[in-house]
């Protein structure tokens, strides 16, 4: 076991510290159809990154959401890959990571959430807390990620706001601190009252211009209140009194510790409430946080460059058949042409042409600091979980594989395309789209996923990106576990006795394939010295 080493002495670079302080790296999480993609577009609109929702700046055509760039996403209207978008607003530089919106893609979503310092949770005001929201909040809670809540679609027929807050608190186990409060709902939605600024923002449907300033009134005592909202004024006054009396006021320390979420109400499709969320991110969300490595904790303002790969994306540009490693900078400053140490292999590599993103649009990055996400052109040498440093032996922690819940075997329409099939599956496996296993008893690669849609996505990408027409059939496997044993002889005996149920993963780790839950339980009872793991760290060779 490696002993913890102290952090190296820091030279103290005021310019670096200033740049790091400006960064806000966050994700947007929600259940499918709660309005996550719309909010993503509107934040980019307010940040000046795009001119109108659905189109990248300077593009003359294309109606797809900026963040849904992959062909299969455009066809199906769901987010299946994680886009990265950088934009500025005020004095801050925002790195927005758009997570997959479909329930099948929890593993990729988890990896994205390891790379952020805060999150916006979007809740559909008509549906409240949904299944995917619960799962994502559990992931955020593992790292005490600060969460801002945006309750969306107030211009539709929705549930009572107090009921929604109670549901968030009781199901998600996080305290709510309302920052804005709705005035009416559905067709009678009139705007919101800002509890901290003592200001009423009046709603007007159909405003698509980010520069639009919604009409405002100063405070609940404004003489125009009853004139403008004759049907809602009394209810608003009583609700605000109730909220202030029973609800918790916003507390920055509780928010940063992940114990409290500030809550905003609005309508993303109409830009209403978006500016307030963006200002909250700017004012309250943390700048890049320290990161835990196996050896020590790395501070974001340390002068030496460090970071980790949290995602591999193949064929972002089909014309160039490229692969990009998404890399979270944890300390120091990136500059083109710099030499870094690849921790897993121990080899040095040069990063000459890193890029920054706007979904699939990219441009060369000439500078990046902690919190920034850069793309590194990758020809197979980088894997998810890899750490790069300026020489120090560090390995960042916290990017796991989960045991798949579904398993399939590929079936080729054309047997002569077997080489292309294997190449495609291995590359998609490295990317994290699926997990790929090589069974001891069969030459056919085995594919593991956390949801059935992943197999459809892989089949589509094999066809469009690798020219392989393949279908997938059930492999008859219930679950998988990574196995380790400190006794080499005992492990050899286990391997010999269970060879028909064993496979290797992409990193060469031993995996036990159980066709039923009973089979797994029996194996654990028969081999008590063997450990069966349902997760492992990326890039980790289990021993």
From Swiss-Prot:
SUPFAM superfamilies noted in UniProt: EF-G C-terminal domain-like, P-loop containing nucleoside triphosphate hydrolases, Translation proteins
Record GO biological process: regulation of translational termination
Highest taxon in the source lineage: Bacteria
Gene Ontology cellular component list: cytosol
Transmembrane helix among keywords: no
Keywords, ordered alphabetically: Cytoplasm, GTP-binding, Nucleotide-binding, Protein biosynthesis
Subcellular location: Cytoplasm
Ranges for domain tr-type G: 21-289
Binding site for GTP: 30-37, 98-102, 152-155
Molecular function GO terms recorded: GTP binding; GTPase activity; translation release factor activity, codon nonspecific; translation release factor activity, codon specific
PROSITE patterns referenced in this protein's UniProt entry, alphabetically: G_TR_1 (PS00301), G_TR_2 (PS51722)
InterPro entries per record: EF-G-like_DII, EFG_III/V, G_TR_CS, P-loop_NTPase, PrfC, RF3_C, RF3_dom_3_sf, RF3_GTP-bd
Record has Protease as a keyword: no
First-listed, main subcellular location of the protein, grouped into a coarse class: cytoplasm
Family stated for the protein in its record: Belongs to the TRAFAC class translation factor GTPase superfamily. Classic translation factor GTPase family. PrfC subfamily.
Function: Increases the formation of ribosomal termination complexes and stimulates activities of RF-1 and RF-2. It binds guanine nucleotides and has strong preference for UGA stop codons. It may interact directly with the ribosome. The stimulation of RF-1 and RF-2 is significantly reduced by GTP and GDP, but not by GMP.
NCBIfam families: prfC, PRK00741.1, small_GTP
Protein name, per record: Peptide chain release factor 3
Species annotation: Thiobacillus denitrificans (strain ATCC 25259 / T1)
């Amino acid at each position: 076991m490696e002993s913890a080493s102290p952090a190296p002495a820091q030279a103290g670079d005021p310019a670096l510290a200033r740049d790091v302080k400006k960064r806000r790296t966050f994700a947007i999480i929600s259940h499918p159809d709660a309005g996550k993609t719309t909010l993503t577009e509107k934040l980019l609109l307010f940040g000046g990154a795009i001119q109108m929702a659905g189109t990248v700046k300077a593009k003359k055509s294309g109606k797809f959401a900026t963040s849904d760039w992959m062909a299969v996403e455009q066809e199906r209207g769901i987010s299946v890959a994680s886009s990265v978008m950088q934009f500025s607003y005020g004095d801050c530089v925002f790195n927005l990571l758009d997570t997959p919106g479909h329930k099948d893609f929890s593993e990729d979503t988890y990896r994205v959430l390891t790379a952020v310092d805060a999150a916006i949770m979007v809740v559909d005001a008509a549906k409240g807390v949904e299944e995917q929201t619960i799962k994502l909040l559990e992931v955020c809670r593992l790292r005490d990620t600060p969460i801002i809540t945006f309750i969306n679609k107030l211009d539709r027929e929705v549930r009572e706001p107090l009921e929604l807050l109670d549901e968030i608190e009781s199901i998600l186990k996080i305290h709510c601190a309302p920052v804005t409060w709705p005035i009416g709902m559905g067709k009678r939605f009139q705007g919101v009252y800002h509890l901290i600024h003592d200001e009423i923002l009046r709603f007007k449907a159909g405003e698509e211009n980010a520069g639009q300033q919604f009409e405002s009134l100063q405070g609940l005592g404004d003489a125009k209140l009853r004139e403008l909202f004759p049907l809602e004024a009394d209810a608003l006054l009583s609700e605000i009194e109730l909220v202030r009396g029973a609800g918790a006021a916003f507390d920055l320390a509780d928010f940063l510790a992940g114990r409290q979420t500030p809550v905003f109400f609005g309508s993303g499709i109409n830009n209403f409430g978006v500016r307030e969320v963006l200002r909250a991110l700017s004012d309250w969300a943390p700048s890049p946080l320290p990161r835990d490595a196996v050896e020590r904790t790395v501070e974001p303002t340390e002068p030496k460059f460090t970071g980790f790969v949290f995602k591999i994306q193949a064929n972002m540009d089909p014309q160039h058949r490229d692969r990009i490693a998404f890399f979270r900078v944890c300390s120091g400053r990136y500059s083109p042409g710099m030499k870094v140490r690849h921790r897993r292999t121990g080899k040095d590599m040069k990063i000459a042409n890193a890029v920054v993103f706007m979904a699939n649009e990219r441009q060369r990055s000439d500078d990046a600091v902690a919190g920034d996400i850069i793309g590194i052109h990758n020809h197979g040498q980088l894997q998810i979980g890899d750490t790069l440093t300026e020489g120090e032996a560090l390995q960042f922690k916290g990017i796991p594989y989960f045991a798949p819940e579904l398993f399939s075997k590929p079936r080729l329409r054309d047997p002569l395309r077997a080489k292309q099939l294997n190449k495609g599956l291995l590359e998609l496996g490295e990317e994290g789209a699926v997990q790929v296993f090589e069974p001891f008893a069969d030459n056919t690669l085995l594919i593991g996923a956390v949801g059935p849609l992943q197999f459809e996505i892989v089949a589509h990408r094999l066809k469009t990106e690798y020219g392989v027409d393949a279908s997938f059939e059930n492999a008859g496997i219930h679950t998988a576990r990574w196995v380790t044993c400190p006794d080499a002889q005992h492990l050899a005996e286990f391997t010999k006795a269970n060879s028909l149920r064993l496979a290797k993963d992409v990193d060469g780790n031993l995996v036990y394939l159980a066709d039923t839950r009973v089979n797994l339980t029996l194996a654990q009872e028969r081999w008590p010295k063997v450990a069966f793991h349902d997760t492992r760290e990326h890039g980790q060779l289990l021993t």
